Amino acid sequence: MSAQDKLIKPSHLITMDDIIREGNPTLRAVAKEVSLPLCDEDILLGEKMMQFLKHSQDPVMAEKLGLRAGVGLAAPQIDVSKRIIAVLVPNLPDKEGNPPKEAYSWQEVLYNPKIVSHSVQDAALSDGEGCLSVDRVVEGYVVRHARVTVDYYDKEGQQHRIKLKGYNAIVVQHEIDHINGVLFYDRINAKNPFETKEELLILD
C-alpha cells in the first residue's frame, strides 16, 4: 500500500506520525505535477490535508490527536511527491478580542501551483518561520518575495490566478518551496541570520 493509499482511507486522520521529518529524501525531491483532470485519489488527498490543518488549529482536536498547529501543508511532507499544497490562514481577533467575522483569510487546496511573477521587494517574518517537518527552532530571517502572483488549479480542475501579499504570500512561498525540494532554512543567511538589507520588509 502506497503512502497515498493509506492516507486517503476513509477511516484515516492525518497526524504528526504521517508527517516526515528533515533528512527524508522526499523533502528534497522536486515533486511531480498532478494529471488533469484530477483523479479521485488526488482530490481526496487534498481534502485530507485540509482536514489536518483544521484539526491542528482546533484546540480540542489538536490535543486529542497530538498535533502541532499549521497554516500550510504540502504533499511531500506526508511522503507523497506531488505538487499539491493546502493553506488555511486564520483571521485573528480584533484589538478588543472580538472574534473575526470570517474564520479564515485564506482557505484553499492548490494543485500544480506556480509563482508566475513576484515583487522586487523582499520580505521576512519578524519571528522567523517554523515547519511541521522540522522539529527544532532555526532562527533567522527567511527572505522571500513581498508579493507574488500564483497560478493553480482547484479540485474541479478550474485554473486560477491569485495575487498575494504579506503573510499569505509568505505561506504560499513556504509551501511551494516544499514541492520544489526546498526547506525554509535554506533561505536564511548562514553567516548573518538576521541580516537586514534596506529594502527588506519585516512583517510582524
Curated annotation (Swiss-Prot):
One of its GO terms (molecular function) is metal ion binding. It is an enzyme of class 3 (hydrolase). It comes from Streptococcus pyogenes serotype M1. PANTHER family: PEPTIDE DEFORMYLASE (PTHR10458), PEPTIDE DEFORMYLASE 2 (PTHR10458:SF8). Fe cation binds at C131, H174, H178. GO terms for biological process: co-translational protein modification; translation. The active site is at E175. It holds the Pfam family Pep_deformylase. This is Peptide deformylase. The gene is def.
